[in-house]
A protein has these predicted regions:
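Cytoplasmic-side transmembrane-helix entry/capping segments in multi-pass membrane proteins
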Residues: 6-13, 64-75, 118-131, 157, ...
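Transmembrane alpha-helices of multi-pass small-molecule transport proteins
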Residues: 31-78, 167-171, 190-205
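C-terminal transmembrane-helix exit sites in multi-pass transporters
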Residues: 54, 58, 85, 103-127, ...
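Transmembrane alpha-helical segments that form core, pore/gating elements
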Residues: 143-207
Length: 264
């Protein structure tokens, strides 16, 4: 993709990685693997990949701004927990669209925290993303408030999807701030470092030993997570948080195509 800016290339690769991750999250959940176990497996694979790469490159593991890196890990864990619940309880494209309210949240938070300007184009994208999310969730809202028989989905899952998007927006702003001084792999490393121990208590009593197919799906969740996280962090280094995350809207397209092909 030589005709695209480097930041756009990174963010599109990130969008593809996250879309494939969401697909295998959905497939793993369909096998009866608990959401938090999927999250822990993702964190374990990402932790190993990040650790090996950092050690091989001679890069210090813990970075310099440890407090902000830890906060990024915690907020990312919260965003992912909410997002995974939405992905496993809603159609893939619908969950993805809700998650992609996060560029709107990123733009607003970036304005207040990073002092990034919100131009007319960015503002238009915010309005359109909110309208899109409302259009998608309207049938469920209508169905919950009337006797009209429409296809409805869990309002809790919808609320969690929106909450996950808000937390993702906050995490992206933190990543942008960290990317000025920290190595991308160090930023990525802190997420599984926090998420793995944090997720274990939530699935310990209902742990499921996956079969071979489930094991492969879980490994792929972690691998595609790493692709998405690393390229997203690199893209954030080169572009403002609001503009960089706008490219991630392509994940909606990727998720829809993958959903049609693999999930009918």
């Amino acid at each position: 993709m030589p005709f695209l800016p480097k930041a756009a290339q990174y963010m599109l690769l990130s969008a593809l990685g996250f879309s494939l991750m969401s697909l295998f999250v959905k497939l793993s959940a369909d096998l009866g693997i608990p959401v938090m176990e999927i999250l822990a497996a993702r964190a374990l694979v990402s932790l190993v990949l990040s650790f090996v790469t950092l050690k091989a490159s001679g890069i210090p593991l813990l970075g310099t701004n440890k407090w902000l890196l830890t906060l990024r890990g915690f907020v990312g864990f919260l965003a992912l927990s909410l997002g995974y619940y939405a992905v496993t309880h809603l159609p893939l494209a619908m969950a993805t669209i809700l998650q992609f309210l996060n560029p709107a949240f990123t733009a607003v938070l970036g304005f207040f925290i990073l002092k990034e300007a919100v131009n007319a184009g960015t503002f238009s994208c915010i309005v359109l993303s909110i309208c899109g999310a409302l259009a998608i969730t309207a049938p469920s809202l209508i169905g919950s408030m009337s006797d009209i028989q429409v296809e409805t989905f869990s309002l809790v899952a919808i609320a969690f999807g929106i909450g996950g998007a808000l937390c993702s927006g906050f995490a992206y702003v933190i990543v942008k701030k960290l990317s000025k001084k920290e190595h991308p792999l160090v930023i990525v490393f802190y997420f599984p470092l926090i998420a793995l121990p944090a997720s274990v208590p939530f699935f310990w009593d209902e742990f499921v030993i996956p079969d071979l197919k489930g094991f492969i799906y879980l490994v792929l969740v972690g691998c595609f997570t790493q692709v998405g996280q690393v390229h997203m962090t690199k893209g954030m280094q080169l572009e403002s948080a609001s503009k960089a995350t706008a490219y991630l809207y392509m994940q909606v397209v990727f998720a829809t195509i993958l959903g049609v092909i693999f999930l009918n």
